[in-house]
């Protein structure tokens, strides 16, 4: 069982990779493609994705949108309020930790840090 591995981060990344292979099987079975959900903050701002996991997609239609823009898009499309306001999580951990727990900052703080180098959050982000 995967739960016997000691490296929890490795286990979470394995789950993302298994999810990706499942999505590719479903897509292939339906003559489809895998559409990414990564946004500007996650993918390009802080690199919050699993290589060969949730980063392994055919197209990334919202890659240039901030998380705030994605939420606004959802509202304009009539997506349920409960979905838009749900705390973001990658769903890879058994303890239900949120993106904010893992990143140490909210998406609002990350967006401000990406846009304004003088913001308080900018110094908290480890820029490569």
For the regions a language model picked out, list residue spans one by one:
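ATP/NTP-dependent adenylation/nucleotidyl-transfer catalytic domains that generate, transfer
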Residues: 1-14, 24, 28-33, 37-41, ...
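Active-site glycine-rich loop that binds ribose-phosphate moieties when present
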Residues: 16-19
